[in-house]
């Protein structure tokens, strides 16, 4: 065995959804934008994504982020989100977790007021997080996400075994195909994970056939990667219960941060909620929630959009210093699907 590379990471979870924060070891090009940093990673360090997200260090549902230096004084840090298959434009559960981890581990200076503000550069745009802390305790993160909007409504498709359904295409930091399961027999619960994953991938392909995806102002954003199933909540006080199916069929354990942003835009467009009306969202596990609110309107080019905020908590799981032998194909990462 010959150790070729060593990388330090922090592990967290946000209402059950994991995050591997890669904060050292990558020599990002000086002065590069976040898109240039992602291209650099794709070309030179995609092996690291695979090694940390996949087995034997990760698993099929692992999620991660490269915490990068800022590209300008307008930002405090950059975030490039990853999983075992690909890259994501943004991630809300990850933003909650990485912001809390940065404050807890001294990766950012704490504001004496007890509320530390962190400006993140993502490939979806500027995301501003506020982390509340008291003494040694880090309490919660609230972030203002990129603007959200509804791109298309009532996209008809057939879901095998569950009949004809409709989806809305909504941007909330990623594009989501949002599907109402009320009236079907499919329930959102951990014991139904395999079926939810399978149906999510089928639904995503059906929606992709029906609509062209293109962000109004960001030319590089043109993909539908997430499908959200929702129905009535099981936790009192929540507006809905949902699960987000993404990438190779992963299931988000948390209520979803970009997902909560998209769901608020979805419900606002349908007249269910209004601006400045707080909501609570429930995730797959039925144990944790996020708080959300649309704090105003804006535009994306000529398209009306809303400004979502999401609040949640994350827990520290531990740290690791990984050695990686790229000459060993198993050590370099594999998936069993």
Swiss-Prot record:
Disruption phenotype: Cells lacking this gene loss their ability to grow on t4LHyp as a sole carbon source. Its EC number is 5.1.1.8. The keyword Isomerase applies. Substrate binds at residues 92-93, 252, 257-258. The keyword Isomerase applies. The active site is at 91 (proton acceptor). GO terms for molecular function: 4-hydroxyproline epimerase activity. It is an enzyme of class 5 (isomerase). It comes from the Bacteria. It catalyses: trans-4-hydroxy-L-proline = cis-4-hydroxy-D-proline. Keywords: Isomerase. Induction: Is up-regulated when the bacterium is grown on t4LHyp as sole carbon source. Belongs to the proline racemase family. Catalyzes the epimerization of trans-4-hydroxy-L-proline (t4LHyp) to cis-4-hydroxy-D-proline (c4DHyp). Is involved in a degradation pathway that converts t4LHyp to alpha-ketoglutarate, which allows R.sphaeroides to grow on t4LHyp as a sole carbon source. Displays no proline racemase activity. PANTHER family: BIFUNCTIONAL TRANS-3-HYDROXY-L-PROLINE DEHYDRATASE_2-EPIMERASE, TRANS-3-HYDROXY-L-PROLINE DEHYDRATASE. This is 4-hydroxyproline 2-epimerase. It comes from Cereibacter sphaeroides (strain ATCC 17023 / DSM 158 / JCM 6121 / CCUG 31486 / LMG 2827 / NBRC 12203 / NCIMB 8253 / ATH 2.4.1.) (Rhodobacter sphaeroides).
């Amino acid at each position: 065995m010959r150790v070729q590379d060593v990388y330090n990471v922090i592990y967290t979870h946000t209402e059950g959804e994991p995050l591997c924060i890669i904060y050292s070891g990558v020599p990002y090009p000086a002065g590069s934008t976040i898109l240039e940093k992602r291209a650099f990673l794709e070309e030179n360090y995609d092996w690291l994504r695979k090694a940390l997200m996949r087995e034997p260090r990760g698993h099929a549902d692992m999620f991660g982020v490269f915490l990068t230096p800022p590209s300008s004084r307008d930002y405090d840090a950059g975030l490039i989100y990853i999983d075992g298959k690909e890259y994501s434009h943004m991630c809300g559960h990850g933003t909650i977790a990485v912001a809390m981890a940065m404050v807890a581990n001294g990766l950012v200076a704490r504001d004496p007021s007890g509320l530390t503000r962190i400006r993140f550069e993502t490939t979806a745009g500027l995301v501003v997080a506020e982390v509340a802390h008291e003494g040694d305790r880090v309490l919660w993160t609230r972030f203002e996400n990129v603007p959200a909007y509804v791109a298309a409504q009532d996209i008809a498709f057939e879901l095998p075994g569950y009949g004809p359904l409709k989806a809305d295409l909504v941007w909330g930091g990623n594009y989501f195909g949002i599907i109402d399961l009320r009236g079907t027999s499919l329930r959102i619960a951990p014991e139904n994970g395999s079926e939810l994953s399978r149906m999510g991938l089928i639904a995503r392909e059906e929606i992709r056939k029906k609509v062209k995806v293109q962000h109004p102002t960001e030319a590089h954003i043109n993909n539908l990667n997430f499908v959200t199933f929702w129905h009535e909540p099981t936790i009192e006080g929540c507006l809905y219960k949902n699960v987000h199916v993404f990438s190779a069929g992963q299931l988000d354990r948390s209520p979803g941060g970009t997902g909560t942003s998209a769901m608020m835009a979805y419900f606002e467009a349908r007249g269910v909620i209004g601006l400045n009306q707080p909501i609570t969202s429930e995730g797959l596990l039925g144990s944790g929630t996020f708080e959300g609110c649309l704090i105003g309107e804006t535009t994306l080019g000529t398209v009306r959009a809303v400004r979502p905020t999401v609040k949640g908590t994350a827990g520290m799981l531990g740290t690791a210093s990984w050695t990686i032998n790229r000459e060993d194909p198993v050590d370099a990462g594999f998936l069993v699907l």
